[in-house]
């Protein structure tokens, strides 16, 4: 279950109902998908082959199709980041630049952890700390950035409005 940390006051929201309510009020789509159907050989595997990535997409194809039909998404892929990722530190520096997009930024966490820092409607930032099974859609034009948690590894399905993917506006 995702958790929220509000930057300015350094408070946390950990209760499932309160997390969902907070995100809904901020216009952030949050869903919990069944991660238990992921086979053992893909669980916590951060060195994925193209075949592994295709298998992950097939496993969650119904969920991807459902959210895509509801929200108009047209493309998806799988990304894996870990200590074995070339230039991981450089990538993270780039990811941590505050930006927005003219479309939603959608991620489903398959393994590992990630954090979206999002500017709230009140202009203050909050973190959404994500774990396996969490799907988040950062709304279009919301200022945000993405980073990893202390384990510095994540496998995520990215879902896009267009086949070109997201274009960051800094």
Swiss-Prot record:
InterPro entries listed in its UniProt record: ARD (IPR004313), ARD_bac (IPR023956), RmlC-like_jellyroll (IPR014710), RmlC_Cupin_sf (IPR011051)
Site entry: Important to generate the dianion: 107
Key word Metal-binding present: yes
Catalytic activity, as annotated: 1,2-dihydroxy-5-(methylsulfanyl)pent-1-en-3-one + O2 = 3-(methylsulfanyl)propanoate + CO + formate + 2 H(+); 1,2-dihydroxy-5-(methylsulfanyl)pent-1-en-3-one + O2 = 4-methylsulfanyl-2-oxobutanoate + formate + 2 H(+)
Protein name: Acireductone dioxygenase
Site description May play a role in metal incorporation in vivo, residues in chain: 98
Record text on cofactor binding: Binds 1 Fe(2+) cation per monomer.
Keyword Transmembrane helix applies: no
Family statement drawn from the similarity comment of this UniProt entry: Belongs to the acireductone dioxygenase (ARD) family.
GO molecular function, one term: nickel cation binding
Gene: mtnD
